[in-house]
Amino acid sequence: MRAETQTIKMTEASSPTPVLEMRGISQIFPGVKALDGVDIALYPGKVTALIGENGAGKSTLVKILTGIYRPNEGEILLDGKAVHFHSAQDAIDAGVTAIHQETVLFDELSVGENIFLGHAPKGRFGLIDWKTINERARILLEQLESTIDPTIRLKDLSIAQRHLVAIARALSVEARIVIMDEPTAALSRKEIDDLFRIVENLKRQGKAILFISHKFDEVYEIAENYAVFRDGKMVGAGTLATTPQDEIVRLMVGRDVTNAFPKQAVTLGPTVLSVRDYSHQTEFRDISLDLRKGEILGLYGLIGAGRSELCQSLFGITRPASGEVTLDGQPLTIRSPEDAIRAGIVYVPEERGRHGLALDMPIYQNMSLPSLTRTSRKGFLTAANEFALARKYAARLDLRAAALSVPVGTLSGGNQQKVVIGKWLATKPKVIILDEPTKGIDIGSKAAVHGFISELAAEGLSIIMISSELPEILGMSDRAIVMREGLMAGQFERAEFSPEKLVRAATGNA
């Protein structure tokens, strides 16, 4: 009997017949066995949580299930009959649809076009029926309790709204199996509640749902069953109602994670960055803050509070309407990201795949991009210098990769985050802004990233850390600023921290 390949067992009363089974699935890449004989079963009307550290094999399983990869070994059964997915369309035709962590949408298309791309309703003479597209899109969005206009372009939406469009797109296909890969990563609590109401409705319709999340509170709230992957194997499966969280953590990482927030005590130095009366035309106003040498300043708030917009302005992505910025006591005017980088301010964005990385390029080139003047000789790039720079920061960050020449897109989320941080550290900054630094990262990798952030602060780097995860703010920050609707709603020293204080400030419930 192999403990690594347990199939989820359900009581006969709940649902004796799985709609989908994967048996003995193995996926082999050059030098790597990404999946090793895993079994999993999904049942109608039930949510199964797929849990594991980044690199455990979850993404590979999803790609097999959605027809992107064909397994080297094993079989997929749909209603007890073997099926073979040769393409993503084969999987869709069989009733399998996916909502991915990084929204795969098109900025220049309308919301309705994105929802029905590839399966647009057509009218007479085979022409696309735009009226029907927009009507159906509006109905789907209303089911998600969203008032997004289907006719506007996607690029005009916020990250949270983009995720709702991605969910609507998945629901636009008549699916029996719905895969949700970190669907709540950019959603507010209200939007998560709305999504979970949708999930409950899908369960009542008999949909089988595979739910991938690193947020244990969400897993226990929405799922009935779980399957834990580690190092390409299934190491545990069962019913969440009878399994404590500590047991799942041990299965995930193969060890106890006792210190998720390894914050080092640091003697803070002088003020490095000072912002006064800083305002944007629409996103934030009257922001004043100071950041000291070696300090981790947490920015907390709900989605849409203006935190990312503030930091993007400090990095030169957008222009402020008014206000002053000083760095090391000297006035600073930032008109572009180049100005910020030259001054020593860098920004690690929330959406790594869209703004932080060139996913098709190798690791070493991604890491050296902001430091081309240091890796070139007489105006010409040298691969040797690029590799040397990448090796230095890959070692420092404990980057897990087969080689520095592999595309960044092949890495797990945690390792992609290390590449983004590494490329900016190579510029030797004074201030680093981390926007949701552990978004989509598993619990083991989170602890590693937190440890590294703490080390950077201990070395004297000044850090602004945006996070929507309250435990992360409380565990890692020396000081926390709460924003609400573009304004500063509160500022707290570490000794004053409490979850209640920060949540009240963020929600306006005094």
Curated annotation (Swiss-Prot):
Pfam families named among the record's database cross-references: ABC_tran
Main location: membrane
Molecular functions per Gene Ontology: ABC-type D-ribose transporter activity; ATP binding; ATP hydrolysis activity
Keyword Metal-binding appears in the UniProt entry: no
GO cellular component, one term: plasma membrane
Keyword Nucleotide-binding in annotation: yes
Catalyses which reaction(s): D-ribose(out) + ATP + H2O = D-ribose(in) + ADP + phosphate + H(+)
Oligomeric and partner information: The complex is composed of an ATP-binding protein (RbsA), two transmembrane proteins (RbsC) and a solute-binding protein (RbsB).
Residues holding ATP: G52, E53, N54, G55, A56, G57, K58, S59
EC number(s) reported in the record: 7.5.2.7
Membrane topology note: Peripheral membrane protein
The family this protein is said to belong to: Belongs to the ABC transporter superfamily. Ribose importer (TC 3.A.1.2.1) family.
Annotated source species: Agrobacterium fabrum (strain C58 / ATCC 33970)
Disulfide cross-links: none
Cell compartment(s), UniProt: Cell inner membrane
Residues covered by the ABC transporter domain: 20-256, 266-510
Enzyme class per UniProt: translocase
Protein name as annotated: Ribose import ATP-binding protein RbsA 1
Parts of the chain that traverse the membrane: none
CDD domains: ABC_Carb_Monos_I (cd03216), ABC_Carb_Monos_II (cd03215)
Gene3D superfamilies recorded: P-loop containing nucleotide triphosphate hydrolases
Annotated gene: rbsA1
Chain's role: Part of the ABC transporter complex RbsABC involved in ribose import. Responsible for energy coupling to the transport system.
Keywords, alphabetical: ATP-binding, Cell inner membrane, Cell membrane, Membrane, Nucleotide-binding, Repeat, Sugar transport, Translocase, Transport
